[in-house]
Regions:
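Ubiquitin-like/PB1-type beta-grasp interaction modules and other compact soluble beta-rich domains
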Residues: 1-99
Length: 100
């Protein structure tokens, strides 16, 4: 039973992450579809970086925030590092494409 003022900690649960081909090719052995344990987008990035060191630097800048040319979507909505993830969430990481 929770006491007044106490918060219950949520245990990380599996979320499904879909990575773009432009990012996956930089990490030999990386999959486009991966399951990681996370309760937020920041924890998801940590999980990806644990699997493939250097992934965090490709997704996030030094502030830290998601890089300008990377978009993360959860349930069809653009997400930030602080966005919470429900168990079984489907997360899409998308790179911006530009050209002239």
């Amino acid at each position: 039973m929770e006491e007044a003022g106490e918060t219950m900690e949520v245990a990380p649960a599996p979320v499904l992450v879909r990575l773009p081909p432009h990012l996956v090719v930089l990490f030999p052995g990386a999959d486009r579809l991966v399951s990681v344990q996370a309760t937020s987008v920041a924890e998801m990035v940590d999980g990806l970086d644990a699997l493939w060191p250097g992934m965090r630097e490709r997704i996030c800048d030094e502030t830290p925030a998601i890089r300008r040319h990377i978009n993360v979507f959860v349930a069809g909505r653009r997400a930030r590092l602080t966005t919470p993830l429900a168990p079984g969430a489907d997360v899409f990481v998308i790179t911006a494409i530009s050209g002239g």
